[in-house]
């Protein structure tokens, strides 16, 4: 896992969704009991990642949004350059 990308994603989640940084681990379930985000929050995540990394998330599966780790893996696999 690319820690730089993971930290950028974590920072974006903290900023956009106002999640306390100390509650957000790389493997925290974003849409489960850990953090409890909803479908509106997923839109914020999509916009944030697309703007931050220039990655198109339209082909992403639900599993790609499970945690910072899975989001990082998706960005690594689809980022140009």
How would you label these PLM feature ranges?
Residues 2-36, 45-47, 51-81:
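Phosphopantetheine-dependent thiolation modules in NRPS/PKS and related acyl-activating systems
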């Amino acid at each position: 896992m690319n820690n730089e990308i993971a930290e950028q994603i974590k920072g974006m989640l903290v900023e956009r969704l106002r999640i306390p940084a100390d509650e957000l681990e790389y493997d925290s379930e974003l849409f489960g009991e850990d953090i409890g985000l909803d479908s509106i929050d997923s839109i914020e995540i999509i916009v944030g990642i697309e703007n931050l990394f220039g990655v198109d998330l339209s082909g992403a599966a639900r599993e790609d949004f499970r945690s910072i780790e899975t989001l990082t893996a998706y960005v690594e696999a689809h980022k140009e350059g």
